[in-house]
């Protein structure tokens, strides 16, 4: 039996429980004191907060990793941050130029971007044209193609530009590598252990950053959603030469609210029309998401 006294007519509601402050620890990946940041809702605001904490310009930050100072593309910060995650900011280091001759259709690059204007190399395919150029490394930001600045371009735009470059004609890439700590110098894609390595959170709650509107605390994606997003990310790489876990998650979210393949195609066009996904990609994605759900039961 409910023993609570009935509320008198006109009585005010009890005050809402205060939302806890979400404070995140951060360091510069090449080495710095630990800073603390809060009050951001998207990646650009996050970069501004990190820059303010360390007295640098936001445009100095190329990308961030979670719980590791290394240039580890599996630890890239995307649209979700675990509430206990430690944020490492990788800032601009040396600029370098390389000349490339496109002897095959594909260069062997997979591109991603930081959500704040910089596209960078996420993967280099073994045995590819780029793999044979020692100066080009995973984590390098692509600043210009043939002196044409691509700062501000999205990853899919950069990938398209590279695909459309004519074969047998040399071109120049201007790259900016992340500034490296002493123990990381000379490493192409791996680095030795850092004395300060943050603990990885085992919690399921994350802060989800949004390009519009306030950030929200949400449960981490389910195993089914995570598996489906990984398959979509693989297809993004295969069809478009990019990897983008947040875009993949948005595609899965669109599929979840679609009654069938045609509704899914319309939903993608409405929400993510700027990407101009090819029809065969949409068909494969719909099938892959269904297979991921079946595989996970």
UniProtKB/Swiss-Prot annotation:
PROSITE patterns linked to this entry: PDZ (PS50106)
Record bears the keyword Disulfide bond: no
Location of the PDZ domain: 97-177
Domain of life: Eukaryota
One Pfam assignment: GIPC1_GH1
Homology family: Belongs to the GIPC family.
Protein name per its UniProtKB record: PDZ domain-containing protein GIPC3
Species: Mus musculus (Mouse)
Organism placement in taxonomy: Eukaryota, Metazoa, Chordata, Craniata, Vertebrata
